[in-house]
Curated annotation (Swiss-Prot):
Keyword Glycosyltransferase set for record: yes
Listed name of the protein: Uracil phosphoribosyltransferase
Gene symbol of the encoding locus: upp
Positions annotated to bind uracil: I193, G198, D199, A200
Cofactor entry: Mg(2+)
The organism of origin for this protein: Pectobacterium atrosepticum (strain SCRI 1043 / ATCC BAA-672) (Erwinia carotovora subsp. atroseptica)
Length: 208
């Protein structure tokens, strides 16, 4: 599995701000979107381009355009919505597929409760977004759904990832690509990433 920890100074700085204990909902939400945008920039660096001729201000001009690769952004509800706008800043024509999976607080197992995928998802590259890759259960379950629907070009974008989640994802889906702003130390006894970001969903939606 291709694993990319984005080490750009802007990414590291913004993620550091997100780790502050007393950060406001507004600021956390803004930074989640901004880091999501920067991760998208990295994840789409290998998209193929082609030369096309357009009418420029001085006549015909040859330019580069993305070559036919359709994209669907797949936020995992609910926290993934906090990164979606940042992703769409880079790929505004992408279609949106939504998957609802939550983690049972006692068993730590993923529980699916909603999915709405674009009709031609088998023709698209999926950018799956979720702030945290902890145990990996929710992400694995989401990718299971995408592959069952015929989508096999999948990239995962997360703000922080635990080594345990990375290992689980690689074992279940070695063909996907992972882009993260940080690979953190690991999980605590409750299954939360340390040092992590706390409960990203609560911080994004102001329910902390």
């Amino acid at each position: 599995m291709k694993i990319v920890e984005v080490k750009h100074p802007l990414v590291k700085h913004k993620l550091g701000l997100m780790r502050e204990n007393d950060i406001s909902t507004k600021r956390f939400r803004e930074l989640a979107s901004e880091v999501g945008s920067l991760l998208t920039y990295e994840a789409t660096a290998d998209l193929a381009t082609e030369k096309v001729t357009i009418d420029g201000w001085c006549g015909p001009v040859e330019v580069d355009q993305i070559k036919g690769k359709k994209i669907t952004v797949v936020p995992i509800l609910r926290a993934g919505l906090g990164m979606m706008d940042g992703v769409l800043e880079n790929v505004p024509s992408a279609r949106i597929s939504v998957v609802g999976i939550y983690r049972d607080e006692e068993t730590l197992e993923p529980v699916p409760y909603f999915q709405k995928l674009v009709s031609n998802i088998e023709e698209r590259m999926a950018l799956v977004v979720d702030p945290m890759l902890a145990t990996g259960g929710s992400m694995i379950a989401t990718i299971d759904l995408l592959k069952k629907a015929g989508c096999h070009s999948i990239k995962v974008l997360v703000l922080v990832a635990a080594p345990e989640g990375i290992a689980a994802l690689e074992k279940a889906h070695p063909d996907v690509e992972l882009y993260t702003a940080s690979i953190d130390k690991g999980l605590n006894e409750q299954g939360y990433i340390m040092p992590g970001l706390g409960d990203a969903g609560d911080k994004i939606f102001g329910t902390k």
